[in-house]
Amino acid sequence: MTGVQTCALPISVTAEQLYGHSYIFLLRQAALLLIGLLGMFVLMRTDYHKLRQPAVIYPVVCVVLLMLVGAFFLDRSHATHRWIRFGPIGIQPSELAKLAVILYLAWFLDQKRRGKEAMEFCKEDFLHTILPAFAPVLVCVALILGQPDLGTSVDILLFATTILFVAGLSWKWIATGSAVALPALYLLITLAPYRMARLLSFWDPGSDPQGAGFQLRQSLIAVGSGGLTGVGLMESKQKLFYLPEAHTDFIYAVICEELGFIGAVIVIALFVVYGRRGIRAAFAAPDAFGRLLALGITTMVLWQALINFSVVLGMVPTKGIPLPFISYGGSSLLVMLLGTGVLLNISQQATES
């Protein structure tokens, strides 16, 4: 799947203008891809049960990293502070928090389930199960919101809720959580002028075509320009400074333009295949920890891809969510590959058992 990016990344004019090197995006991503594939292979050959012991520590580590970002480093790239930078190397802790949340929830819910025949333990037990399960998740989400990064926060809440639902969380608690989350989301949008502008431009992209609605408008132009078969590899015009973030959050628009409707459907089909294999691995896992871990990794990828597709196609307001495995970005690519390595190990053990 990652190979799709070689035909869509703006590796020519855009990279030359920004960095003075025509292939810097491709070279950087290729290096990170090799590192990620190595990590994926190591985790694929490592028994996933070894992750059960220190899993409770991972959220704490990510919280510390996120606090370091907010309090000390404050790298104001695009008016945000989402990275810890060590010279030319940048780490995005919010991406690491995704795996940490999945590991913690799988570990915690597995511990609570010991001795029970069915995953019914968290239907009513709010104080002893739901609250301690979700508290570290909410801490991570709160810190990510402070960066600010609403898109990643929503993504984490979605796959965390999915894990809890499969573990037995009743619709009553989901409805209660939604009733609390929706007013909070409204406040987060209305209190931030740029978010409000994005929401208004989502309802009417033509209301501010040179301002808040510019990115969505250019994205839709790219998608519509592709037609059935696309304009051809490396022939995208929208990525040449017309479409902001063409190599990251809006790379799917470039794929639609270059490969057309057929290429766009193929990319979606690849994620469907990934999801199908991941869900099969989850249901065939030897134990509850593996089942929840596989489900968490799979839904992490699928929710993120769905949000990205929806943003690019103008179905939801614009958010900064990369397309898994394809968008340019080292932290996201590494997390997705490492998660896939764990998923492959679970699938392998399920097959052997």
Model-derived segments and their meaning:
Residues 1-9:
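Short, small-residue-biased leader/transition segments that mark boundaries at the very start
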Residues 201, 205-248, 252, 259-263:
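TM-adjacent membrane-interface loops and short helices in multi-pass inner/ER membrane proteins
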Residues 149-154, 231-236, 246-248, 261, ...:
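Transmembrane helix boundary and interhelical junction motifs in multipass membrane proteins
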Residues 8-10, 24-29, 329-330:
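Membrane-interface transmembrane-helix boundary segments in multi-pass integral membrane proteins
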Residues 306-353:
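A juxtamembrane structural motif centered on a specific transmembrane helix
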Residues 87-97, 146-148, 227-232, 321-335:
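Glycine/serine-rich anion-binding loops at beta->alpha junctions
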Residues 16-215, 253-311, 338-342:
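Hydrophobic alpha-helical transmembrane segments of multi-pass inner membrane proteins, especially
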